[in-house]
Amino acid sequence: MEYRDYGVFLDIVLDREINPEKFNELYKELLVNYRVIMLQLKAQSPIIRLVPYVEKQHVIYKYRWALTATTFITVFLTGYGLTSSFLSLISQANTTRIIAESILYTATFLLTLLAHELGHLFISRRELIEAEGPVLLPAPPIQLGFIGTFGAVIFTKTPPPTKKTLAELGIMGPLMGFIVATIIGLIGVFISPTIPLDVADKAMASGEIQQVDFSSLMFYLLVNMRRVVNGKLLIHPVLFVAYVVYIVTFINLLPIGQLDGGHVVRSFTRGKTFNAMGLAVPVLLLSLGFILEVFYGIGDIYIGVGIASTILYLLTGRHGHPGSANQCDESHCSWCIVLYILLLVLTAPIPIV
């Protein structure tokens, strides 16, 4: 055993690796009782690195209440815009109902966001991972071209101890958000009215409504639970919540940087492999989008997702992913991988031709 004191952290060179069970025990004890983060680095001779945990609040977290209040307003404005248009089409628009259904839209949308983040928070609390949040992030409302929010975030301040925990941390958020969105979607399907074909055609010609150009498999399955004869299903704003959440979930599951999909995929891949995948994803999506657009005119959704993934790669993917605290750990979460693939399939955007 050899000690190397670097001032900021201490390295201990070992003759052999600490087994995963013992590492987990020591990791939690050092963090809880001594506020020290323990890492096991993979090298010719395994290294235990001890780093003091410094209590520091994220700058965004300091403004959480202001951000949350602003998000409520911007999401409500989005709901107001969607609801007023929706109710006008079915000749049921009045101020009281518009406000009531805008509140319903706001509540359901924010519920899916909070369910997602609470899924992450559940794993963090269970595994004693230091985290703070969730914090809601406002964005321009639909009147200004967006959906009122950039989502929600929790700030993880200590690394997951094992690869299994890393995968669980990554999958639990999308899974909880998906489940809540699907329940909301089921409600939305059965409160969405149908309109006659001639009325739908007239409304589309005037630009009052638009045909959905792309969907996801899960949204398709939801909508087809309603049998519509000689008419069109008019998407209720509550059903629109599920539609948006599925698209956002797919993007979040891409294996890029520290997106949730990045956590899951990094748990069973090496650093170089993961970095190559993160770079390949935007290229593949953009290539697929351009090919489909040139030959079939249906590639715009993949171009859009490809642009989004490029931005996410530049923001979070260029520096890779640190992985778990124990680099020598070989644990895997099989059910996380199965759920990851299932969620990708169910939420992937599919052009409607």
Language model features: what each stretch is:
Residues 1-353:
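Hydrophobic transmembrane alpha-helices and their immediate loop junctions
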